């Protein structure tokens, strides 16, 4: 069995920026779609999968249509669930609680939210279903969880890569169990 190549594309900026958007269904700025389509046009894709949240799904619809490929929505590619913090500006959250979360999202998840291990587990399951030459339009947290699953990096290690809006992360998935892989490309927008 050969290695599979998959590409993870972070959705474009949401309409309201600067908020913790986990499962909050905030639409993206649709104007970003042409740039995102241009970014993936050369990838020889066969499949397009997207998170079911609007900020990813709407852009996935445009990309799949432009490429003439079917689209599959998969809620396992959603962002981390921020629970009671979902949709809030970080400044409105208790600084000590937010700091504990960023330092250790496993032991200090948001109130009513998802642990890091839960995000990793659902993304791991989603990765296992991917076919080669697949584009997944998703969220930064899910992309970081995929990196953690495939490379063994912990939650601190995956933050070493900047994954801004519209970042395209290309991965080679090795056959076998457990899942493993390597980063083979990262494309982001030029610095402003």
Predicted regions and their residues:
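Amphipathic, non-transmembrane alpha-helical scaffold segments
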Residues: 53, 116, 120-124, 160
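Phosphate-handling substructures
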Residues: 26, 65-122
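Acidic, low-complexity terminal tails and accessory targeting/binding regions
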Residues: 1-5, 65, 80-91, 132, ...
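Short beta-strand scaffold positions
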Residues: 50-51, 121, 137-138
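Generic beta-sheet signal
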Residues: 6, 129-141
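Generic structural signal for well-ordered alpha-helical scaffold segments
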Residues: 37-41, 120, 124-132
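Short, active-site-adjacent cap segments at secondary-structure transitions
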Residues: 15, 56-57, 79, 142-145
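Active-site-proximal alpha-helix that buttresses catalytic centers in soluble enzyme cores
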Residues: 3-69, 114
């Amino acid at each position: 069995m050969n290695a599979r190549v998959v590409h993870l594309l972070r959705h474009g900026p949401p309409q309201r920026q600067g908020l913790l958007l986990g499962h909050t269904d905030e639409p993206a700025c649709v104007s970003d779609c042409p740039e995102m389509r241009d970014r993936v046009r050369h990838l020889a894709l066969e499949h397009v999968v997207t998170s079911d949240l609007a900020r990813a799904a709407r852009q996935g619809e445009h990309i799949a249509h432009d490429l003439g490929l079917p689209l599959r929505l998969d809620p396992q590619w959603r962002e981390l669930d921020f629970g009671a913090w979902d949709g809030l500006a970080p400044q409105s959250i208790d600084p000590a609680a937010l700091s504990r979360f960023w330092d250790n999202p496993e032991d200090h998840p948001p109130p009513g939210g998802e642990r890091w291990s839960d995000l990793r587990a659902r993304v791991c399951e989603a990765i296992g279903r991917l076919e080669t030459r697949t584009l997944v339009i998703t969220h930064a947290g899910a992309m970081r969880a995929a990196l953690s699953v495939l490379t063994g990096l912990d939650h601190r290690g995956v933050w070493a890569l900047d994954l801004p809006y519209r970042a395209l992360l290309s991965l080679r998935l090795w056959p076998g169990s457990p899942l493993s892989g390597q980063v083979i490309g990262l494309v982001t927008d030029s610095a402003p």
